[in-house]
């Protein structure tokens, strides 16, 4: 794939852009093998990849420049603003909307926030796209409420020109620090969430709920985990760090009770909405810290299978030891950081790595997702 931003040295986010995707995958597999080191792996499955461009469903744009000449993108190598509205990672309709949002900010006369002077109002524009419907959630991250009337004044025209915009909100982030969003969310539309569907499973996206940025590869990740769980035929399952419930909902059926734990309340609301839409009453989702849940009194009945999908920091020593002590038949570990994955796998005792599969969730970058199936030592022979 060719990218003008990369070729001109304006953006280096896609560090591997100059290499064919096949070569990128070989490098990523080699890195994963190196990080896992001496850990024995029974089966290394072929990597899963998706489209090379037009796949990304989320844009995080820094707003720079001036109210009369705003720029949506990133600071360039020389510190000057770089407009990323034509980034080829985004679908064409998303690029068109990003370009229009530049004009919207100019018409509204909202001064971009200047970090060097701690002045201005508009810090970021966050745009999320539903792949199934092509609808958008648009968020303006502001320093204060002062610019909200300007947004409301121009919003009717924007919604008329781009009817695919379903959700619009303002996020207030008043502090002068490198933080993407604040606590308060003010909706400017009646709708407060996007609808998404992966593999026939209804999923929902709210402003603060984490959602995978590559829908095609994410749907295959969830489907693979569900297939592995189905092969195990467990009678109970936990989905820790569950987000909007993607893994647990894909595994759910009328005979499999699922407990999903996630610290972000908005994500849990999405998961509960999905469970209701699926007509399943044996799914339980709670807004709790996953480690605290596993260490607490609620976790006395150990499930047969535990899925963990932690943030980049991994699950950590305490939870690794707890899972080892629990001794479920299987642990499925989905990781976006192979370095912390390797550390955690070395700390989980009594299990063998039955399968490892790389999912190229972030083409052209160094990042990737890994799915691991860990089987209890005594259970390996019967489950293979």
From Swiss-Prot:
[4Fe-4S] cluster binds at residues 3, 11, 14, 87. PROSITE patterns: SAM_MT_RNA_M5U, TRMA_1, TRMA_2. The active site is at 336 (nucleophile). GO terms for molecular function: 4 iron, 4 sulfur cluster binding; iron ion binding; rRNA (uridine-C5-)-methyltransferase activity. S-adenosyl-L-methionine binds at residues 212, 241, 262, 309. It catalyses: uridine(747) in 23S rRNA + S-adenosyl-L-methionine = 5-methyluridine(747) in 23S rRNA + S-adenosyl-L-homocysteine + H(+). Keywords: 4Fe-4S, Iron, Iron-sulfur, Metal-binding, Methyltransferase, rRNA processing, S-adenosyl-L-methionine, Transferase. Pfam families: tRNA_U5-meth_tr. It is an enzyme of class 2 (transferase). Its EC number is 2.1.1.189. GO terms for biological process: rRNA base methylation. SUPFAM superfamilies: S-adenosyl-L-methionine-dependent methyltransferases (SSF53335). Belongs to the class I-like SAM-binding methyltransferase superfamily. RNA M5U methyltransferase family. RlmC subfamily. Catalyzes the formation of 5-methyl-uridine at position 747 (m5U747) in 23S rRNA. This is 23S rRNA (uracil(747)-C(5))-methyltransferase RlmC.
